[in-house]
């Protein structure tokens, strides 16, 4: 028996009796019995055994907090579990006494957000932090909480500045489903900023998504997209971005423009590609 366990036994068991084995009664006296779960044992820095089943200590903490079990939460925190999981677990089940007890252990409350799966809990976390709706919407984009934006769609419909900000953020963070939803449902004033962001970040998927969205709109309205395509073809050709050049040509951009600019700026990769294609066609 380790010295720390001996000390725990002397502190909690009657008559300083050190048991030879640990049944549920003894474990309960020691605070090592988790109601409805069984025995609780620390087996390493980041792991515990619950009724001999291994589980990450932070996951155990989240479960204990979601049950409102202060004793087990305190024990796991003393074993260096992450207090963020205690607050998140308590928030999920609305145990606000537990939430407020451990909330101040977290320096930046936004650090809890990656741990939250449920959109309602995500919103409660912002309410606790007295965040603005703009802050809530921004983090909803970053952490893929589309149901939050859907919930506030009518509110956002009258806030074009915020919609534009969220759209650009979704582009920068590569949240493609958010890009599609914000543009399609809320609308944005400056859609082509998507192409600028895609080129800066070398994000070919976003670049292609932009064309699939805007060309459908232009064709349905009877507009000719040639000017738009060749404008961005000039941009990506000047920069020597072959994958972007090919994608633009795929959507209808002029191959001649790409070759002309590749010659002007001596982009050998682009020139070799078209020379190889030409020789293969011959």
UniProtKB/Swiss-Prot annotation:
A Pfam family of this chain: DUF249
Lineage, top-rank taxon, reads Viruses
Task: Give the range the annotation lists for the signal sequence.
Answer: none
Q: Keywords on this record?
A: Early protein
Q: What triggers its expression?
A: Expressed in the early phase of the viral replicative cycle.
State its role: Plays a role in virus cell tropism, and may be required for efficient virus replication in macrophages.
> What does the similarity note say?
Belongs to the asfivirus MGF 505 family.
Protein name (record): Protein MGF 505-3R
